[in-house]
Amino acid sequence: MNIVLLGAPGAAKGTQAQKLVAEYGLAHISTGDLLRAAVKAQSELGIKAKEYMDAGQLVPDQLVIDLVKERLSADDAKAGFILDGFPRNTAQAVTLDFELQNMGLKLDAALLVAVEPEVIVERLSSRRTCKECGYTAPAGTEICPNCSGEMYQRDDDKPETIRKRLDVYENQTSPLIEYYKGHGILKEVNGDRPVDEVFADVKTLLSL
């Protein structure tokens, strides 16, 4: 099964992705991780991406698509994949569909993990992040349980910043949701519940 994962920052869609990976052996393809790995490896695509990132510019869609195509050719993606962080808009979705078709692939579902904005604001503004390893934990956690590093509140986890991020997400993603709805593959799950309840619904929606 090939899935595009949709959801606002803080919707805990990554948690659902991890559970799908663990239970069904799907490849979790995060475009953010792909970009960081390519830059670190100094691959041809990574060097190109770094030029844009260093200049504070968005990495062009085609470059991201090329990274995704490269990743999809890996053996672990043969059983299916979860694409996380791309596409972000309708133009990217159209390009992705075209490239997947050229590879003999198609999307089976666009899974939207939906959570009310104020729930997300409360979730994100109450979390702390480790300065050393990036581990996240609830407010009040001063020492990282993973590596004993110092915990802090990221600037983008402050309520006013979160609301701005959610506005940007809404403006970008609403047309994308309509795009996948029009293609008959949108599956929406209420993410404002315990993780295992959400996952049970995800499996039902995806007929797994």
Residue ranges and their predicted role:
Residues M1-L208:
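Glycine-rich phosphate-binding loop of ATP-dependent small-molecule kinases
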